[in-house]
């Protein structure tokens, strides 16, 4: 059973609100030097924005990697989304994975500065 247009619009709006909230949180964390938390919030901002885009166009993905893949194939590779934004999303996913590791990794804000 698919979503109605109203349900789809509501879901897109909720995802975009979450993305905006997370990017504001990421900026705050970045200003405090909380690099790992900023990377996490930047990633989830990208993730929810990408999910909103997929939902809007009737596409879906069931995993984080799937979302990145569907987003890349349908929007970055087609030129609908700038490659720099696609690269930023990929970079934030990598940083999220690294910062989720309980072992110290020598993480700094250098990689985030490229955003």
Which role does the model predict for each range below?
Residues 1-115:
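Terminal alpha-helical segments
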